[in-house]
Regions:
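Active-site-proximal cap/loop segments of hydrolase catalytic domains
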Residues: 66-194
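Cap/lid segment of the alpha/beta-hydrolase catalytic domain
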Residues: 1-117, 152
Length: 194
């Protein structure tokens, strides 16, 4: 197996690190791609070993982990550029990393699946809404997709502590409007079957 870190350029010019893992004897052009992200709480996402990934890698899937803003991959300032009123950088970075890898010929949108859980599930909902053309599928594990409704209720056990990460939309109209502009539930496209 091979691992390589590459750098891609986000729409605002920031350079985003992306870790790639693939099976050494499998060509990396037009592969199926499994791209996963988190981008919150200053937590770094690294392509650590997991036996469950071996089957996927053995089938020729390229495993990609972009270190998007909001995570801790590049230090405190990196985190600060991806939380509160900068949260959209996380989503844009993930989409831009996906597109850069696809433009490089590593995968096509028809063979790209995105994955994230919890806050990464919010990431998945946002990127599915913002750039559905980039992904054949999106897997959101325990997603935080109705973030605005949840974070408006201070009686919920985690709400007040979550204000440090997302902002306090209950008492700040700017935070409310910003969260409403990206939360997956608030921005889900209308069904064509209505």
């Amino acid at each position: 197996y091979m691992e390589r870190r590459v750098w891609v350029t986000a729409r605002d010019g920031e350079r985003i690190p992306v870790s790639l893992v693939w099976r050494r004897d499998v060509p990396t052009c037009d592969s199926a791609m499994f791209i996963t992200g988190y981008g919150a709480y200053e937590i770094s996402s690294d392509p650590g070993f997991a036996v469950s990934r071996i089957s996927m890698l053995d089938r020729g899937v390229l495993y990609a982990v972009p270190g998007i803003r909001g995570g801790g991959e590049m230090g405190r300032a990196w985190y600060e550029q991806g939380h509160l009123l900068n949260k959209k950088h996380s989503f844009e970075d993930f989409i831009d990393a996906t597109r850069a890898l696809q433009r490089a010929g590593l995968a096509s949108p028809l063979r790209t699946v995105a994955n994230g859980g919890s806050a990464g599930g919010l990431l998945m909902g946002a990127v599915a809404n913002m750039a559905p053309e980039c992904y054949a599928g999106v897997e959101a594990d325990v997603p935080f997709v109705d973030a605005l409704t949840s974070i408006l209720d201070p009686s919920l056990p985690l709400t007040v502590t979550e204000w440090d990460e997302w902002g306090d939309p209950l008492h700040d109209a700017d935070v409310y409007a910003y969260m409403k502009s990206y939360t997956p539930y608030e921005n889900a496209p209308d069904s064509e079957n209505d």
